[in-house]
């Protein structure tokens, strides 16, 4: 089998290019150079970092891209006007089959627009989608789909999201029979607006065809409870849940720290106990840490395109690279196309 080539956007993210280069170097060294990295970005900013990390012995090439799509750029406009950007050029390499996957912690909207514009859709896919991880009670994670790529969804779109994410979970996440729940205002059949009733019927039909394991409606409190592996909703609802979830650790932390300090000052708690409590608090919220998985793929585009959080660290970049490798090896896109054809 030929060595895989993964393109990494050196200019993507708030901490680029330093954290991107560091994460790329870590991935290659940790993996024993089992794949090739094509790092793409502005030469004057990236090459000094490559020298700093003594990357000569690594399976890494560099390609200059003079333009950068920033977090402030309007996605659709930037993708069209900045054709020489690292983001667009990296995806074009994948389209031309000169690389197997593209990884970036850059502008999410631009990544979605460019992935669709450059790579196109897999056969049978009506709309590509993006999902998010949520912690859950017990083992595993809950995946919510869609979380912002599609805010105006038809029932058939929601069903395809469930089907594509089912394939991803089976082969990329090694979940044998992931359960699918439809987010609604009640768990009984017949609840919710008309488009959700129609979606329920289509999901049930997909389950009868053995495409998914549909368990019915789920409610908001079921997300963290882990009732379903996959929770399906439109992008407006999903993005709202995602942003709310991201705010939880910061909000509780802002309450916890002063309360802890007050207890120490009052003598109700000594410093060592406070330190242990702080460690416990940090451990509780580890499942909310986006660094663990690094990023998420756009499901339904004709190529592997993985986007990370704008604040991605070197650890997140490294894990995105591993995710790309695993998706390629498990032929996730081929399996999605086969299901939908």
Curated annotation (Swiss-Prot):
Its EC number is 2.3.1.274. It comes from the Bacteria. GO terms for biological process: fatty acid biosynthetic process; phospholipid biosynthetic process. Its main location: cytoplasm. Keywords: Cytoplasm, Lipid biosynthesis, Lipid metabolism, Phospholipid biosynthesis, Phospholipid metabolism, Transferase. Transmembrane segments: none annotated. It is an enzyme of class 2 (transferase). Pathway: Lipid metabolism; phospholipid metabolism. GO terms for cellular component: cytoplasm. GO terms for molecular function: phosphate:acyl-[acyl carrier protein] acyltransferase activity. It is found in: Cytoplasm. Pfam families: FA_synthesis. It catalyses: a fatty acyl-[ACP] + phosphate = an acyl phosphate + holo-[ACP]. Belongs to the PlsX family. Catalyzes the reversible formation of acyl-phosphate (acyl-PO(4)) from acyl-[acyl-carrier-protein] (acyl-ACP). This enzyme utilizes acyl-ACP as fatty acyl donor, but not acyl-CoA. Homodimer. Probably interacts with PlsY. This is Phosphate acyltransferase. It comes from Chlorobaculum parvum (strain DSM 263 / NCIMB 8327). The gene is plsX.
């Amino acid at each position: 089998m030929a060595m895989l080539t993964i393109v990494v956007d050196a200019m993507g993210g708030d901490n680029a290019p330093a954290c991107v280069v560091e994460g790329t170097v870590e991935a290659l060294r940790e993996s024993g150079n089992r794949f090739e990295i094509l790092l793409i970005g502005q030469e004057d900013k990236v090459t000094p970092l490559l020298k700093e990390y003594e990357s000569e012995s690594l399976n890494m090439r560099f390609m200059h891209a003079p333009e950068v799509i920033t977090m402030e750029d309007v996605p659709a406009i930037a993708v069209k006007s900045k054709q020489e950007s690292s983001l667009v050029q990296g995806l074009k390499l994948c389209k031309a089959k000169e690389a197997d996957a593209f990884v970036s912690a850059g502008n999410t909207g631009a990544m979605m627009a460019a992935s669709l514009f450059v790579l196109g859709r897999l056969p049978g896919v009506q709309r590509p989608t993006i999902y998010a991880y949520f912690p859950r009670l017990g083992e595993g994670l809950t995946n919510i789909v869609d979380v912002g790529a599609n805010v105006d969804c038809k029932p058939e779109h929601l069903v395809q999201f469930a089907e594509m994410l089912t394939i991803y979970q089976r082969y990329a996440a090694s979940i044998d029979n992931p359960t699918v729940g439809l987010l609604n205002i009640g768990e009984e059949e017949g609840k919710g607006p008309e488009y959700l009733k129609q979606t329920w019927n289509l999901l049930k039909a997909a389950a009868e065809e053995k495409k998914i394991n549909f368990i019915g409606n789920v409610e908001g409190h079921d997300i963290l409870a882990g009732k379903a592996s996959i929770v399906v909703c439109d992008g407006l609802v999903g993005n709202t849940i995602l942003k709310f979830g991201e705010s939880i650790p910061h909000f509780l932390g802002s309450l916890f720290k002063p309360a802890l300090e007050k207890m120490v000052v009052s003598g109700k708690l000594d410093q060592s106990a406070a330190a242990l409590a702080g460690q416990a608090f940090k451990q509780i919220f580890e499942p909310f840490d986006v660094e663990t998985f690094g990023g998420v793929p756009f499901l339904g585009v004709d190529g592997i395109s993985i986007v990370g959080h704008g604040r991605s660290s070197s650890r997140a970049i490294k894990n995105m690279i591993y995710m790309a490798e695993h998706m390629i090896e498990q032929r996730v896109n081929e399996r999605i196309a086969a299901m939908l054809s």
